[in-house]
Every structure is written in structure tokens, then in C-alpha cells.
């Protein structure tokens, strides 16, 4: 199976006052083109589909358009809630949408939502684990020994895949690889916690046995510990420290007994740029016209921009 792994769409997001919905639609149109070009058979959306729990109507319509286009192409969608999403709202009409091969997991109840698809090698099972906090797992699994985020996710996942079992995990958590935290950017809500050392995380070893673990939560694309545990990253730059970064979608070739991820570059409608210089130069007409999204850092300390 060819699985396209996306995460952290943050539909409805604004950066420095700029509405990014046209940019987000442009990227989603590219995703549809990638699906056609690479014979994509399923799409994973690993959380933070919206930027807020109450997204603007235009963002909801954009997601509706995207899911409808995938349904018309007979491409199943496997989507989970992230920490920016409203789990309850994302679950709305989940039963009806399943009939169109759109599988949503908003709220955690007692176990990941399990979806079984067929490919040329037989059954391929997807475990959909939405963003969950230890307190929620304690409430749903009162007999489990929950000490921290790592033990909470271990309990939430339940039994790991056995030998010969073909399973893929979709999750939205902070994950450690080899004892190291992933590289974060300023647009993530966890960035401040990482900077002060208070973040809780899950050990990537918890995902042993899965053919592939499709992660969301971190906006820089990267593997965690091994190539088959991966953050897709956000499809657009959402903070200045990401300016110039190459964004991508992950095409995962899932075989009989393993998976091989491949990065497919995404091209933004507008590049985010960080300019420095004298105030009069930065505010000159030719500079303003040439740049779409900029952060102006003036040499004059009294300037307010």
C-alpha cells in the first residue's frame, strides 16, 4: 500500500495577521496531485487538522472540500484529533463519514480506533490514537498504572502488534527517540515546555512492532529513533524560525513485512521570509511589494511595526 502521511494542517491559521487559507488550499491541491502521481491508496492525517477548537467557517469548508475530493478518488482517509482540535467536534458524523471511507478518531475512550483496509498483501490494520493526556487515560482506564505520559500511552495502546501482524499507528504526541527530544519550532504549543525542560514525552520504543508510526505534533519533518517512526511536519511554515525550510509529505511504501518512507517536497504559494535592515529600507515600496510574508526588524529601537 502507498500511504500518504500528513499532519499539522492547522486549517484556519493566521500568521502575523495574514490569512493562510489560500496558501492552505494551494498545498492541499498539491496533495491531490501527489495522490494521483504516486498511486496513493490511503491518506493519514495525524492531528491538528484545525488551528483552533473553534475554527472559522472557511476552514471547515476547506476540509470538507479536501475530504470530498479524496472520497471522489476512492482514497480512504484516516484522521485523528490533535491538541489544537476539538475532539468532540471532530467526532461529529464520524459514523456516517465511515461509509465514505473517512475514518475519524476524535475522543479517546478506552483504546485506539481500529480500521482494517485491504491491499495486495492482505489486511492492513490502522490504530488511530488521538491526542490524549495522562488524566484522560486514567479516567478511561481506571485500573491501569499511569505514572506519566509514557506509561499513559503504553496503556492507551494496549497490546502491541505480534509477529506477522501488519499494523500502522497514527498518533499525535511528543515522542523521544534514543532519549532525545525531536527538533521543535516556534509555531508549536510545546515549544515553550521544551525550552524550560518541563515537557513530558513518550519513548519511541513503545511503538515496537508497528510497520510504521505516523506522528503529528512537531512541525519540522523528522524521524524519531528509526526511519519508520516519523513526524510528517506541517505542510507550510507557520513560524519565522521555519522560514526557508523545505516542507514535505511522506509517501510510505508499505509491504508485506515492512515500510519505506519517502519525502515528497511541497511548494508553498508564498515563501515566508525574515528580513533585517534599516527601517526606511524595509518599508520602501519595492521591498514591501516583493515580499509576501515578512518579519521586519528595525534598527530604530523606538519603531513600532
What are these regions (language model features)?
Residues 71-79, 292:
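Short, surface-exposed connector motifs at secondary-structure boundaries
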Residues 1-68, 72:
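N-terminal active-site segment of His-dependent metallophosphoesterases
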Amino acid at each position: 500500500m502507498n500511504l500518504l502521511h500528513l499532519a499539522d494542517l492547522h486549517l484556519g491559521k493566521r500568521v502575523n495577521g495574514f490569512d493562510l487559507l489560500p496558501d492552505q488550499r494551494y498545498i492541499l491541491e498539491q496533495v491531490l496531485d501527489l495522490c494521483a502521481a504516486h498511486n496513493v491508496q490511503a491518506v493519514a492525517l495525524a492531528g491538528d487538522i484545525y488551528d483552533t477548537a473553534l475554527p472559522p467557517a472557511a476552514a471547515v469548508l476547506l476540509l470538507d472540500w479536501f475530504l470530498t475530493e479524496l472520497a471522489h478518488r476512492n482514497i480512504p482517509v484516516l484522521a485523528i484529533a490533535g491538541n489544537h482540535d476539538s475532539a468532540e467536534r471532530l467526532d461529529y458524523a464520524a459514523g456516517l463519514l465511515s461509509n465514505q471511507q473517512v475514518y475519524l478518531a476524535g475522543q479517546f475512550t478506552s483504546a485506539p480506533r481500529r480500521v482494517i483496509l485491504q491491499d495486495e498483501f492482505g489486511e492492513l490494520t490502522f490504530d488511530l490514537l488521538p491526542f490524549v493526556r495522562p488524566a484522560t487515560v486514567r479516567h478511561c482506564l481506571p485500573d491501569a498504572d499511569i505514572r506519566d505520559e509514557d506509561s499513559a500511552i503504553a496503556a492507551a495502546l494496549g497490546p502491541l502488534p505480534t509477529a506477522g501482524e501488519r499494523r500502522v499507528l497514527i498518533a499525535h504526541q511528543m515522542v523521544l527517540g534514543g532519549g532525545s527530544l525531536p527538533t521543535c519550532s516556534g509555531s508549536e504549543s510545546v515549544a515553550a515546555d521544551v525550552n524550560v525542560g518541563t515537557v513530558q514525552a513518550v519513548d519511541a520504543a513503545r511503538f515496537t512492532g508497528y510497520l510504521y508510526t505516523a506522528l503529528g505534533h512537531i512541525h519540522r519533518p523528522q524521524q524519531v529513533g528509526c526511519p519508520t517512526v516519523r513526524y510528517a511536519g506541517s505542510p507550510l511554515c507557520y513560524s519565522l524560525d521555519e522560514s526557508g525550510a523545505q516542507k514535505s509529505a511522506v509517501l510510505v511504501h508499505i509491504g508485506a513485512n515492512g515500510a519505506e518512507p519517502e519525502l515528497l517536497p511541497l511548494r508553498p504559494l508564498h515563501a515566508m521570509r525574515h528580513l533585517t535592515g534599516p527601517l526606511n529600507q524595509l518599508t520602501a515600496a519595492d521591498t514591501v511589494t516583493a515580499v509576501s510574508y515578512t518579519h521586519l526588524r528595525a534598527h530604530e529601537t523606538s519603531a513600532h511595526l
